[in-house]
């Protein structure tokens, strides 16, 4: 049973800090780490580790963050299904406090601007399962994904998993 994982790949910029700064305050960062993340990317990697057949359908733009994502995908054996040259991918600044509490600041990019024509390239007969990351079903992208699902042949026979982020 093959799964199509639809959603986002973004760059996570993680910074370990003792505590969050007060407004206007400057504090030192103990450690930084840059990794590829995003719900769909993380789910695909879990499926990969479990040896489940799947494809990762995330838009990869053009720019410095898209380049990091493209390299991360290649390292995991993924080829971009969607190339969006007009926009860079987004990133998330994660502030991790000493007690482990995490605070996020997200800059959206190509992964939040789904286009109807992206789905025209996908042979849905290959998939029994469809996983959709919830962050992508918000706003206009959600409308586009919902409209696409209505056009999927035999959609009622497929297992659809929707992950709600918030």
Residue ranges and their predicted role:
Residues 48, 85-87, 97:
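A generic structural signal for short, solvent-exposed coil/turn residues
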Residues 38, 64, 140-143:
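Residue-level recognition of alpha-helix initiation/capping sites
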